[in-house]
Regions:
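Iron-sulfur-associated redox domains of electron-transfer enzymes in respiratory
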Residues: 84-421
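Conserved hydrophobic beta-strand within the GNAT/NAT acetyltransferase core sheet
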Residues: 59-60, 220
Length: 421
């Protein structure tokens, strides 16, 4: 029996107006195959009714109260994610979100409204190619993120960092982790290419388990969609208590065009189809459009175009035009910098402060290839604009009603699916 039918048969009680239930999120996002596993719905639920299922997707763990928040804050549901781009402080704020700058048109081309697009990478406060001065074992592209977090921990600027580390039980599967020491940050260094439902992991009980006070200051490292959820929750007035992400004082987005399903990518495509035991893998990277897998001796055992693995990508990622992580205080990734370095984009006062604290630990030089960032940013936007079934507008209201979503997506390959339970 479907969740909708159960609800409709509940003692004939008329539904209060304006409610959106978990079942709508389930139909419009999860069962429609559009969930991007950011964990925002788990984090935002005030009654802790949503949990993380065995398949790493949101599930209803107890009665839904119909508060609508899981729908409202989902980047594939009711959250107009591009509206979070305007929530970053700084003079470039308005310019970065202006619609005529995000159409995906080539620089120099008119957009049909009398204006010319400006590269999004040109709207940040600062931009560098950077790496850690000290080697970080296993660190990605110069260990920049690890060095930043360690410097902030050492300075007492943050008490912990929400990040991803490799699972202790499933090889090459990422899991969320709250690191509270430089040693824990170093142990989690490197990139793994599946989502972790990370925001669903963060709550006050976690702080207590990790020996942190209720007012602990945290950095969050994640994909742009995770940052979108954090910034949206920060912007909402919480009349009862606070949100579970109030402790996050710094967001670091990892440049991202898509994330992958662990089972499909590592278990099926890598281990089963290509005959590579997961325990034999020492490193996985995406370098210049190639998926590169190496063994523990750094011998390359797979080097193929990443497009060969797109069947394992999360379907909902195609709707995201936020490769650069435009809502984040800092964005970091390999595109635009030479091997062994990371691109660092600074957008906010919090980002500038973090960089200043960590500056002595980093080697900074001018961003080497901003045009590479711009090219991939425009390609990412074009893909999203073709895939989205709704208008893309950072200046529109932040939240999208479920009925509006239903109207936009009905009849498409991303239409809501009501599954029997």
């Amino acid at each position: 029996m479907s969740g909708f039918k159960i609800r409709d048969e509940m003692n004939g009680v008329r539904e209060a107006p304006g409610k959106t239930w978990f079942w709508e999120l389930e139909a419009g996002v999860i069962d429609a195959g559009r969930c991007i596993q950011c964990g925002t719905c788990v984090a935002v639920c005030p009654s802790d009714s949503i949990a993380i299922g065995a398949d790493d997707l949101p599930v209803l763990a107890k009665m839904c109260t119909g508060c609508s928040l899981c729908w409202d804050f989902c980047p594939r549901g009711g959250l107009r994610y591009e509206a979070t781009w305007t929530l970053v402080d700084g003079l470039e704020n308005e310019a970065r979100a202006a619609p005529w700058k995000i159409t995906g048109a080539d620089p120099g081309e008119h957009n049909g409204n009398g204006t010319r697009p400006v590269r999004a990478v040109d709207t940040v406060r600062e931009r560098y190619s950077a790496r850690s001065r000290q080697p970080v074992a296993g660190g990605q592209d110069g260990g920049l993120v690890s060095a930043l977090l360690i410097a902030l921990l050492d300075a007492g600027e943050i008490d912990g960092a929400l990040l991803a580390r490799q699972s202790e039980t499933e090889r090459w599967k990422a899991e969320p982790y709250l690191a509270t020491t430089p040693e824990e940050v170093r142990a989690a260094a490197g990139t793994i290419y599946n989502q972790t439902m990370g925001l669903g992991y963060l709550d006050r009980k976690l702080l207590s388990r990790r020996g942190l006070p209720p007012d602990a200051r945290l950095a969050a490292v994640g994909t742009p969609c995770e940052v979108q959820g954090i910034k949206a929750m920060h912007a909402r007035p919480w009349h009862r208590g606070s949100s579970k992400v109030d402790n996050v004082v710094l967001t670091i987005a990892l440049l991202c065009t898509k994330s992958f399903n662990y089972e499909k990518l590592m278990v099926e495509l890598v281990a089963a189809q290509r005959g590579i035991p997961l325990e034999a893998i020492g490193r996985v990277d995406v370098i210049r459009g190639q998926l590169v897998v190496q063994d523990h001796e750094r011998t390359t055992i797979i080097e193929e175009p990443i497009k060969n693995f797109h069947g394992a990508a999360l379907k909902g990622c195609d709707e995201c035009a936020d490769f650069l992580g435009n809502a984040a205080d800092l964005s970091v990734g390999s595109v635009g910098s030479a091997d062994g370095r990371s691109t660092l984009l600074v957008r906010s006062e919090a980002g500038s402060r973090a960089l200043e604290i960590a500056r002595d630990c980093l080697e900074l030089r001018d961003l080497e290839r901003p045009e590479a960032l711009d090219k991939l940013d425009r390609l990412d936007k074009r893909t999203a604009f073709k895939t989205l079934k709704r208008p893309f507008d950072p200046e529109a209201p932040m939240f999208i009603d479920y009925l509006e979503h239903l109207e936009r997506y009905a009849g498409s390959d991303r239409a809501p699916v009501v599954a029997d339970r």
